[in-house]
Amino acid sequence: MTRHGKNCTAGAVYTYHEKKKDTAASGYGTQNIRLSRDAVKDFDCCCLSLQPCHDPVVTPDGYLYEREAILEYILHQKKEIARQMKAYEKQRGTRREEQKELQRAASQDHVRGFLEKESAIVSRPLNPFTAKALSGTSPDNAQPGPSVGPPSKDKDKVLPSFWIPSLTPEAKATKLEKPSRTVTCPMSGKPLRMSDLTPVHFTPLDSSVDRVGLITRSERYVCAVTRDSLSNATPCAVLRPSGAVVTLECVEKLIRKDMVDPVTGDKLTDRDIIVLQRGGTGFAGSGVKLQAEKSRPVMQA
């Protein structure tokens, strides 16, 4: 075997690895990437701004947002829905006017055809032996009647000259679907209302440190009951009555026994315990999906 046969480009088979590599480089097909720790947000960061929250609120599904960011998002969505609804109503009115115009034109054609048939009726008997009787009417008042024979095939082959400006086909506007009036959560896609947002109160590790000092620390908050450190590796939950953040271990071992909020003393239900969606640690065992996918056009032979 010569040296050329040992090169990586000398294979006669297009391997699976080469196909995946070329697909990723071309940009076609579904693109997959495994997220690293640098691409994962912290548990106390907003899902929109990806920054530590100053006034955090949580949705019933456990997604944390900055109050200002999520309210601005809801306001923007309502404006967008109003704009889409206005465009939909405008197109609907235009289509209704077009249908009325078509019905009016069809009615006029029907009346015109009826008048043409009425004017072609002969009021006196004709002599079958005269030349006028052969044509049915006088040469001066002759009306073109409908053809009795089969339709001409030449007319079917005649196509409109689409390159002439008067015969250029008109592009129809895209039909708009009626937009939904429901504002959805940007993360879960479920309906979201301002009344569904629950204020969250984190317990700082050191109450003497200001907010700027907390941001620079890796461990900023602790459980409101057990004082355990909170991080992406610690599953935690929010208690709806008080907004306190506690670990799931505390919920299972302490809170679920009496179902009482340890901060305010209010009775709790399963709906009042909101599991906080954390970003994960970057490891597969953290229980968080770390595989991102993006659908792209597919090139097929």
Curated annotation (Swiss-Prot):
EC number: 2.3.2.27
Region of interest (U-box-like), ranges: 55-75
PANTHER family documented for this protein: ENOS INTERACTING PROTEIN, NITRIC OXIDE SYNTHASE-INTERACTING PROTEIN
Nucleus listed as a keyword: yes
Record's keyword terms, sorted: Cytoplasm, Developmental protein, Nucleus, Phosphoprotein, Transferase, Ubl conjugation pathway
GO molecular function: ubiquitin protein ligase activity
Reactions catalysed, as given in the entry: S-ubiquitinyl-[E2 ubiquitin-conjugating enzyme]-L-cysteine + [acceptor protein]-L-lysine = [E2 ubiquitin-conjugating enzyme]-L-cysteine + N(6)-ubiquitinyl-[acceptor protein]-L-lysine
Entry comment, domain topic: The U-box-like region is a truncated U-box domain. It is unknown whether it is functional or not.
Residues modified as Phosphoserine: 36, 107
Assembly information from the UniProt record: Interacts with NOS1 and NOS3. Interacts with PP2A holoenzyme, containing PPP2CA, PPP2CB, PPP2R1A and PPP2R2A subunits.
Short sequence motif Nuclear localization signal: positions: 78-101
Gene: NOSIP
Subcellular location: Cytoplasm; Nucleus
Protein name: Nitric oxide synthase-interacting protein
GO cellular component term of the entry, any: nucleus
Function: E3 ubiquitin-protein ligase that is essential for proper development of the forebrain, the eye, and the face. Catalyzes monoubiquitination of serine/threonine-protein phosphatase 2A (PP2A) catalytic subunit PPP2CA/PPP2CB. Negatively regulates nitric oxide production by inducing NOS1 and NOS3 translocation to actin cytoskeleton and inhibiting their enzymatic activity.
Family membership: Belongs to the NOSIP family.
